[in-house]
Amino acid sequence: MILGIGIDLVEIKRFEQLARQTDNCFAKRLLTSTEYAHYAKLRKDSEKSSFLAVHWSLKEAIYKAVNHIKPLFSQLEITKKNQRYNCQIDPKIELLLSVSYSSNNITAICLAQQTPWKN
């Protein structure tokens, strides 16, 4: 059963200034400790702004799809395995995530569905 669909579109340039912050306060609020550790290893501002934009967009899409749960962004951990983004919020909910990139924008989509085999 589909629980919700969320979509978010962001301009990467909105995250360029945030990626240059020396105190990283935005990144620390948005990312989990594991995500932040990965972010901190990035050297180029373009990589950092893209990382923040993808994570913001995915977390926004997830929030919109499961807004009845009211998850905090800092509790949503985005992982990437085999070129697929993943996030686990509840064993009974499967999140299907998709990200599309262009030179200026990132679009994220989340389809949240109840997993019938885990009721």
UniProtKB/Swiss-Prot annotation:
A Pfam family it matches: ACPS
Cited InterPro entries: 4-PPantetheinyl_Trfase_dom, 4-PPantetheinyl_Trfase_dom_sf, ACPS, Ppantetheine-prot_Trfase_dom
UniProt enzyme class: transferase
Known cofactor(s): Mg(2+)
Record flagged with keyword Cytoplasm: yes
Protein origin, superkingdom: Bacteria
Known catalytic reactions: apo-[ACP] + CoA = holo-[ACP] + adenosine 3',5'-bisphosphate + H(+)
Gene Ontology biological process: fatty acid biosynthetic process
Location in the cell: Cytoplasm
Family: Belongs to the P-Pant transferase superfamily. AcpS family.
Protein's name according to its UniProt entry: Holo-[acyl-carrier-protein] synthase
Species, as recorded: Mycoplasma pneumoniae (strain ATCC 29342 / M129 / Subtype 1)
Gene that specifies this protein: acpS
